[in-house]
UniProtKB/Swiss-Prot annotation:
The lineage of its organism: Bacteria, Bacillati, Bacillota, Bacilli, Bacillales. Belongs to the TcaA family. A zinc finger (C4-type) spans 4-21. It comes from Staphylococcus aureus (strain COL). This is Membrane-associated protein TcaA. Induction: Strongly up-regulated by teicoplanin and vancomycin even at lower concentrations (10 ug/ml). Induced by oxacillin at a very high concentration of over 1000 ug/ml.
Length: 460
């Protein structure tokens, strides 16, 4: 369609004269317009053909850009750079994230220790060089899948391994720190509380039993901890150093605010060694001059005393109090017995025992003769006065005499004797009719006018 320039009437393109005003249209202008429309149509067709190619080219450019972006963050070299940057910048949180595995969670404090250990035991420059070389070799190798970075002393400090691929094109490198188990071996049952893997942890170790406290990556550790025993609660640290271990475990050194007590006794020479006891905070224990007692918390007073027996009588020292301010890791204390009191008692008892032994020697000399006479004469009356009537021993000897089964005895020796009230226990060494030496224990009763009579006997 076209418009008449004179009256504005619409007309078809091929019309030469306006039907309304008779104006004659210019044929050249119509031809030009037709040619222009055909050119536009042709250009539109060309543009429509070029659009898919342009889109494809744009997508290709995007893919290339994306590839380089992915390579910058996911290639083995990029993965290495992330770890190196974290260690160089002491980024303990990033290192903890990179080294944590499903089985072993590494917290930021462990990572901090690990970073320092690398710098001290490998050297940052050497570590970076070793790591880059290791990653490069693994990336190029078709057979090797893992390798270790080591310290100057040859200990493994980082495991580098292939772990599948990232985005099809890039080898996925896995960085894992090897672990060891720190072990404790307390003298008594102990509960340890500390932080590990970002969480609070509690370990209970039995007395004199090796107990691991967890899995830790390489480092020199000084972990804040609390420990509890029957003696109290202690604040301090658990210390262990990977440099001091060539095995899968590493010994823990305990560093707590504790006191160990060494006890010296004076005035105890007359006491029976096996009877000596030490009582600390109401807890009684056997005494040994070579033993240290504890540990005990350094923030609480300690009460201590000692006891021992002489001739079955118990003697005790005064109770001493060691102030918390006087407690040290190794604390020595001396406890004094009243030696004069003990010696007087022992002397008195020894006189009594000698007197008793003399009586028993006389008694058993007569008893052995009477026993043998009863055997030879088959007459119980010879020995009856030495045995308490009504006792089981009385009836037993009487029966043996009648049956002729009474044993002959000779050469009685008093080995030991104790008196408790009117009862006396004596260990007597005899020679029987077969010529064999035997020890027998007799129980006697002391009656009126100090008369002794046997109640029972048994083999030692």
């Amino acid at each position: 369609m076209k418009s008449c320039p004179k009256c504005g009437q619409q007309a078809q393109d091929d019309v030469q004269i306006c039907t309304q005003c008779g104006h004659k249209f210019d044929s050249r202008q119509a031809f030009y317009r037709k040619s222009t429309d055909e050119d536009i149509q042709t250009n539109n067709i060309k543009m429509r053909k070029m659009v898919p190619w342009a889109i494809g080219f744009f997508i290709l450019i995007l893919i290339i850009i994306l590839f380089f972006l992915l390579r910058n963050f996911n290639s083995p070299e990029a993965q290495t750079k992330i770890l190196v940057n974290a260690i160089e910048n002491n980024d303990k949180q990033k290192v903890a994230t990179l080294l944590s595995t499903k089985d072993n969670k590494v917290d930021s404090e462990e990572a901090k220790v690990y970073i320092n250990y690398i710098k001290d035991e490998v050297g940052l420059k050497q570590f970076v060089s070793d790591l880059k070389n290791t990653v490069h070799k693994l990336n190029k190798s078709k057979t090797s899948v893992a390798s270790y970075i080591q310290t100057r002393s040859g200990q493994n400090i980082l495991r580098v391994s292939k772990n599948g691929t990232r985005y099809i094109f890039f080898d996925n490198m896995s960085f894992t720190a090897p672990t060891k188990q720190p072990i404790v071996k307390p003298k008594e049952k102990t509960k340890y509380e500390f932080k590990s893997g970002g969480k609070k942890k509690m370990v209970i170790a039995e007395a004199n039993k090796v107990t691991p406290i967890g899995n830790f990556i390489p480092g020199t550790y000084r972990i804040p901890a609390m420990k509890s025993t029957e003696n109290g609660d202690f604040a301090g640290h658990l210390k262990f150093d990977f440099r001091q271990s060539n095995s899968e475990t590493v010994d823990v050194t305990e560093d707590f605010e504790e006191a160990n007590i060494s006890v010296t006794l004076k005035g105890d020479t007359k006491l029976n060694d096996s009877s000596k006891k030490v009582t600390i905070n109401d807890h009684e224990m056997a005494f040994s001059s070579s033993k240290t007692y504890g540990p005990y918390p350094q923030n609480k007073d300690i009460t201590i005393s000692a006891s021992g027996k002489a001739k079955d009588k118990t003697f005790t020292t005064q109770t001493k109090t060691i102030k918390a301010s006087d407690l040290k890791y190794n604390t020595e204390i001396t406890l004094n017995f009243d030696s004069e009191d003990i010696e007087d008692y022992v002397e008195k008892k020894e006189k009594e025992e000698n007197s008793l032994k003399n009586k028993l020697i006389e008694f058993f000399a007569g008893y052995s003769l009477a026993n043998n006479a009863a055997f030879n004469q088959s007459d119980f009356d010879f020995v009856s006065s030495y045995i308490k009537k009504g006792s089981s021993f009385y009836d037993d000897v009487k029966k043996r005499v009648s049956k002729g089964s009474l044993m002959m005895i000779s050469s009685p020796q008093i080995i030991d004797a104790e008196k408790h009230g009117d009862k006396i226990t004596a260990t007597v060494r005899l020679i029987n009719e077969n010529g064999k030496q035997v020890d027998k224990e007799y129980e006697l009763e002391q009656g009126s006018q100090d008369r002794l009579q046997l109640i029972k006997t048994s083999e030692k």
